[in-house]
Amino acid sequence: MKKYDVQKFELLSNEQIADGIFDMRVKNDELAPLAKCGQFAHVYVPSKTLRRPISVCDSENGVLRLVYQVKGEGTKIMSEMKKGESVDILAPLGNGFKIEKGKRYCLIGGGIGVPPMLYTAKQCENPLVITGFRNKDLIILQDDFKKAG
């Protein structure tokens, strides 16, 4: 199999976690396990020409987690997708990050730049994670980071 491919993923959930921010979980036992921290996926949106690039937030047990912010028509359509739908995704894309054993990492991100840090934090040993958000209504994934260590 290639390093990446276009395949159908089953939409397990697509929930709003903050104002205009959604947490989409899609299942594909073949492609999801290939994702590395720092990679992204291209999500096909019906009636739109271009796919939407979304950072990989996490990948576990054949489930790819994509956290995205509604910014235009394409991501608005994505936010309306329902559990059980089939989602056309090209993944995993990008080189990802190389995490070296025995090193401590400091991960810094803000807003919608925070989601790809979660998968990275889970791969690191005792990472220092610093996040920032415009206001309290946009704070996301803090419990997930605590669980990651």
Regions found by a protein language model. Give the residues of each.
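Ferredoxin-reductase
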Residues: 2-83
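FNR/FR-type flavoprotein reductase catalytic core
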Residues: 73-149
